Each structure stands twice: as C-alpha cells, then as structure tokens.
C-alpha cells in the first residue's frame, strides 16, 4: 500500500485499474511492481480474485499461460500453488507439447491470499467503489468517476471489468442484472465507451449449479486423485512479500520423499491453521445418462440459448450441456467431473454441466445423473 489515496486532478496516479478479478489483480501488481503509483478500484474489496466459476487454475490451453504470467513477474502461479487442494498434470501419458498442469484451488483461500498480496504491495492503493464513467479531456482518457461522484485521475486507465460490464444473468426466462449472482453489474461504464465511439459486443459464459457434497453417492463415481509428484506452476519467487499464505501436503502424496510434509512456501510466510498436513482432495468422474438427455432435449425451447433470449457469443471450447446434446447428437453420454470448492465448504462444482435452463429443469437434470 502507498501512503494514502490521491483524490482529484491535482494528485494523479500513474495507473488506475478498474476491476479486481484475475486480470485486474495482475495488471495492478505489474504496474505497482514496476514502480508506478497505482490505484485499483472494485465494487467489493471482499470479492477480490473471487473464483466465480470453476475454482481451478490451468488446464488445457491455460496452464502454459499461467506459467507465462509467472515468468513475467505475475502472481497467479504462486497463488495457485499455495492454495491448491489438488494438482494434476493433464495428458501426462503424452508428450510435453500437449501436457497441461491444472490445480483445483480452495476457492476462499485463493481469494484471501491474493487480496493479502495486493494489500502488502508497495505503490498500490485499493478503493471500494463502482466506476460509473471515464473522464475525457481532449479525446483522451485522464481519469474515472465513481458512483459516489469521486474522481480519480491518472496517466493510464486499465479496464478489467470481466462479466460485470452491463452484465445480465439468465436462468430460463428469468433475467437479472449482475456481474455474477449476488453482485451488481457495472452499468455506467458502458455508456462512457459508447460516448467515445467504441463499439460494444456482448459475450456469453455459463456456469453449473453447485450441489451439496452430502447429497452425492460417491460409490457410483470414479475417483480422481491428485498427482503423487505434483507439477507446480511457479518457477521461483524473488518478490519476498511478508506474511503470505502457506500450504503443506502430507507425505502420502510425495514420491520417494524422506520428509514428513511436502512444502509449497515462499520467504517469510506464516502458516494457516486450516491447511497444514492435509492430503490433496479427490475429484470424481461420472457421465450423463439417457434420462439426462431426455430432460435437456425436451426443454430446449426453455433455454435462453435456443429461444433467442441470449444474443452473446459463447466460449468455443466450453459448451453448455444444451449445446453438447445438440451439437454432438451422436454421443449418448457426456463426461462430468465433480470438484470440491474448498476444504471448508460442502459445495461441489459439476464441471461439464453449465446451463441456462430454468430452475425446475436444472433440478430434474441433476436428479437424472
């Protein structure tokens, strides 16, 4: 943190970052670590780096990017290594060109640690406010205006709003404004872009319902354990940030180790009481069945994706369950992964079952698996 917030035109920052998700955190840290006086603005300081969808880092076409961020001095790799509850190297039986490290993280531990890193970073201020608009002078962005009419000025403004920019949430025919469930969307900022003549397009992403761990019959599922010899994301750490989180895994997950615990730690870290000495947590695999297909296909007309209600373009390699049954009609079943959201929660994420179907249909679909 710096010595104090800089308000008004007479006290500009070098850089202002709007948003505190994965991109915003890396942008703010990169700026501050290069010596620039930086301000990060977010609507809620308690949801910095919140893993809104799957609490995992890396995987196919993503694991290499995490390592590239690390090589450039970023924090994501270290944050994942120190808060992971399971490590897996995907495509381990194939060549290194297609291998991909992946870590299932503790959703809250990841969020809390990243916030702590930001709070300790020199040259970086954090402020809770919704950015309502950009301030232009002479055709150039020179600052931002918040929902409280507070103005901050800077030489550079970085916008990392993610799903919050005029976000809409669809559950069947039900539509609500929001960046994610429980959080407001950023409405005013879109108007600033339009005023500047910047064209806006709408993108789409989806997420599955979370389920209660105690409701799962694990005897019907295939267990997926973490790797015995974990492949980590971070190459090294020379940042020397004090009092950052620490993870230990028990010896049963370390190959040929003479040590009692496997340590993922960095200089001057303190230990967290809920992590030391605990094993990696298993994920579980299952499939959709004929009943699942029936429920989805019988209700396609209720899906916002197929009724024309959703106009945005979705991610190519993360199709919804509706898309899977339509685009891959020849497949009788689709693979699903049940993944824990953390050590201290009973919530589980169903990887492969993202949907925008109505609540009742989602319930029938879940009960069919």
Give the predicted meaning of each segment.
Residues 310-332, 339, 356, 367:
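Core mixed alpha/beta domains of very large multi-subunit molecular machines
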């Amino acid at each position: 943190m710096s010595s104090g917030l800089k308000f008004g035109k007479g006290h500009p920052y070098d850089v202002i970052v709007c948003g505190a998700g994965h991109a915003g955190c890396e942008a703010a840290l990169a700026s501050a670590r290069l010596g620039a006086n930086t301000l990060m603005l977010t609507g809620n300081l308690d949801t910095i780096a919140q893993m809104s969808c799957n609490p995992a880092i890396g995987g196919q076409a993503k694991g290499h990017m995490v390592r590239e961020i690390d090589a450039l001095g970023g924090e994501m790799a270290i944050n994942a290594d120190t808060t992971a509850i399971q490590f897996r190297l995907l495509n381990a039986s194939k060549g290194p060109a297609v291998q991909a490290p992946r870590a299932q993280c503790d959703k809250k531990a990841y969020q809390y640690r990243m916030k702590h890193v930001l709070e300790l970073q020199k040259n970086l201020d954090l402020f809770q406010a919704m950015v309502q608009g950009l301030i232009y002078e002479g055709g150039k962005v020179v600052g931002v205006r918040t929902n409280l009419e507070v103005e901050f000025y800077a030489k550079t403004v970085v916008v990392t709003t993610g799903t919050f920019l005029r976000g809409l949430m669809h559950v069947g025919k039900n539509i609500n404004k929001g960046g994610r469930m429980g959080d407001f969307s950023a409405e005013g900022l879109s108007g600033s872009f339009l005023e500047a003549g910047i064209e806006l397009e709408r993108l789409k992403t989806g997420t599955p319902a979370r389920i209660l761990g105690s409701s799962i019959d694990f005897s019907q599922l295939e267990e997926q354990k973490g790797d015995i010899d974990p492949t980590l994301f971070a190459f090294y750490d020379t940042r020397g940030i004090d009092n950052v989180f620490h993870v230990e895994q028990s010896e049963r997950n370390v190959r040929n180790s003479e040590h009692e615990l496997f340590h993922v730690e960095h200089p001057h870290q303190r230990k967290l009481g809920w992590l030391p000495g605990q094993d990696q947590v298993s994920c579980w695999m299952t499939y959709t069945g004929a009943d699942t297909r029936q429920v989805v296909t019988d209700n396609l007309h209720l899906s916002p994706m197929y009724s024309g209600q959703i106009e945005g373009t979705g991610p190519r390699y993360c199709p919804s369950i509706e898309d899977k049954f339509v685009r891959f009609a020849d497949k009788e079943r689709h693979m699903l992964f049940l993944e824990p959201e953390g050590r201290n929660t009973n919530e589980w994420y169903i990887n492969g079952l993202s949907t925008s179907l109505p609540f009742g249909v989602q319930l029938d679909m879940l009960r069919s698996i």
